[in-house]
Structure formats: structure tokens, C-alpha cells
Regions:
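Serine-hydrolase catalytic machinery in alpha/beta-hydrolase-like enzymes
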Residues: 15-119
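A conserved short beta-strand
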Residues: 143-155
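Active-site signature of alpha/beta-hydrolase-fold catalytic machinery across serine-
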Residues: 54, 136-140
Length: 227
């Protein structure tokens, strides 16, 4: 990178440094005292951990799961200025952000397992931008993933180049009027998975870029089979 000042060229170099920050996550304990599986949620862009957790609690049967909602590290104020929301990453320093996020997820899940009675079963559930994090955590996280729920978000391109990934069962959901996760994007994801002999479950429903009761019921059945 260079800038021109007084007819002279000034060279500017870009660097990165590893920094420590604190992440935030919410836990909804199960209704039972016995060890339970973990359902880990990743919210969409401009949302927060509370928003995603509220959706997870509405899924039938999740009272028998430990619910864990992780908030993205990049916080900012909502347009109204009344709420603190987050995103997972931007295109800037993308590879470093992916590494940081996967390490963050590893630490959160590990901390929860150390302090709560859980089984070995972990399912990652993402909405919108959070879908990419669910896929990445499943593919490269330290904790074995037993299922992925992907609502209204696509598979990150870098994972398509890694044929060594052992994918767990996958449920992909899309609203028929969703203008962000289009039918073409869903078809592209399914085409990729079919090319590696993975056949995700799918749920199409009459709505847009959102959670619905129909989809939550489908997730409930998916989780029942995994548990």
C-alpha cells in the first residue's frame, strides 16, 4: 500500500498482532440433573446471544439438552443504539479471524464441559452468518461434532477445498422467500455435499430469513435421532 504526499510516494505496510479479548456466552441448564448433550448456538449478523438462545429454547425437546449460545467477538451498537449486538467476522484479515473464532469456540465448549454434567454429544446450530461458524466448528474444532443445524446460511468456501473433513449428520433449512440464502445458494451447498457422498436433511418452509415453528419442529426430530 502506498500514498502520495507532496509528489513523494510513502510506503505503508500492514501488520497483525495476536490480542486477548473476552467472549460472552449464555447457558440454559437442562431440566434434569443427569448428564445431557450440548446444543451450541451461533447467532446471525447484528444479533446477540440472547436472541439465539430464545430460539433454541422454543425447539421441542431441548429442555433435555444443555443449551449454549455463544456471542460473536465483534460487538457494536444496533441501529437504534439501544442494544449491543455482534458479528462473527468481516473480510478483513479473514483467515486470522477464522482461527480466532474456532479457538474461541473450543475454549467455550471446553469450559462448559468442565463445569457441567454433559455427555459426549455436541450439536452446532447456526442462523444466517452463524451458520458458517457452525460448519467451521464442526470441521476444525477440538470437540467432536455429532450434528449440524444450518438455517439460512451457506457453507464457507474454504471448507469445500478440504476433503479430509468427516461431516456429521446435517440439517439445512431455508425459507422459500429468503432473499439472502437463496435457492441457488442452497442448491450449491447440496451439490457439494452430494459430490462427497453426504446427504443432508433439508427443511423448506413458507417464510423468509427467519426461524419458524415448522423448522423448529424439524430440528426437534433431527436432535431426537442424534441424541
Amino acid at each position: 500500500m502506498a500514498i502520495i504526499k507532496n509528489n513523494s510516494t510513502i510506503s505503508i505496510s500492514t501488520h497483525t498482532v495476536k490480542a486477548t479479548t473476552h467472549g460472552r456466552y449464555l447457558i440454559r441448564r437442562p431440566s434434569t440433573s443427569v448428564a445431557t448433550p450440548i446444543l451450541v448456538g451461533f447467532h446471525g449478523y447484528g444479533e446477540h446471544a440472547e436472541r439465539l438462545l430464545s430460539e433454541l429454547t422454543l425447539i421441542p425437546g431441548t429442555d433435555e439438552w444443555l443449551l449454549l449460545s455463544i456471542q460473536g467477538l465483534h460487538r457494536f451498537y444496533s441501529k437504534s443504539g439501544r442494544h449491543v449486538v455482534s458479528s462473527w467476522m468481516t473480510r478483513q484479515d479473514r483467515d486470522s479471524a477464522i482461527t480466532d473464532n474456532v479457538a474461541y469456540i473450543n475454549d467455550v465448549v471446553g469450559a462448559v464441559r468442565e463445569t457441567h454434567a454433559t455427555t459426549s454429544t455436541v450439536v452446532y446450530c447456526g442462523f444466517s452468518q452463524g451458520v458458517a461458524m457452525a460448519y467451521r466448528a464442526a470441521a476444525h474444532g477440538n470437540h467432536r461434532c455429532h450434528g449440524i443445524v444450518a438455517l439460512a446460511g451457506d457453507l464457507p468456501p474454504e471448507l469445500q477445498d478440504d476433503r479430509g473433513i468427516k461431516w456429521p449428520p446435517i440439517l439445512i433449512g431455508r425459507g422459500n422467500t429468503d432473499e439472502w440464502y437463496t435457492q441457488d445458494k442452497m442448491n450449491a451447498d447440496l451439490t457439494f455435499f452430494h459430490s462427497i457422498n453426504i446427504k443432508p436433511e433439508t427443511c423448506r418452509f413458507n417464510a423468509g430469513h427467519e426461524w419458524t415453528e415448522d423448522f423448529r419442529n424439524h430440528v426437534s426430530q433431527f436432535l431426537r435421532h442424534i441424541r
